[in-house]
Amino acid sequence: LAAVNVDCSGYPKPACTMESRPICGSDNTTYSNKCNFCNAVVESNGTLTLSYPGVC
């Protein structure tokens, strides 16, 4: 399995769309889309990573 990276430059954003493109984070939480995931990455000081695209 190749590591999948998400470019979170330009985050955090104050508001995310309701778009549903689930991402599973390394904390075993399903984020509804890249925006929500990237905001969480910034909040975690970069410790949160992407496990895989899709629901955990």
UniProtKB/Swiss-Prot annotation:
Any one Gene Ontology cellular component term annotated for this protein: extracellular region
The residues that the database entry marks as glycosylated are 45
Q: Does the keyword Repeat apply?
A: yes
Site Reactive bond 3: give positions: 18-19
| InterPro entries hit by this protein | Bifunctional_prot_inhibitor, Kazal_dom, Kazal_dom_sf, Prot_inh_Kazal-m
The molecular function terms in GO held by this entry are: serine-type endopeptidase inhibitor activity
Disulfide pairs?
A: 8-38, 16-35, 24-56
**Keyword Ribonucleoprotein among UniProt keywords:** no
Pfam hit, one: Kazal_1
Q: What is its main location?
A: secreted
Q: Which UniProt keywords apply?
A: Disulfide bond, Glycoprotein, Protease inhibitor, Repeat, Secreted, Serine protease inhibitor
Compartments it resides in: Secreted
Residue ranges annotated for the Kazal-like domain, each copy included? 6-56
- This protein's domain notes: Avian ovomucoid consists of three homologous, tandem Kazal family inhibitory domains.
Identification of the protein by name: Ovomucoid
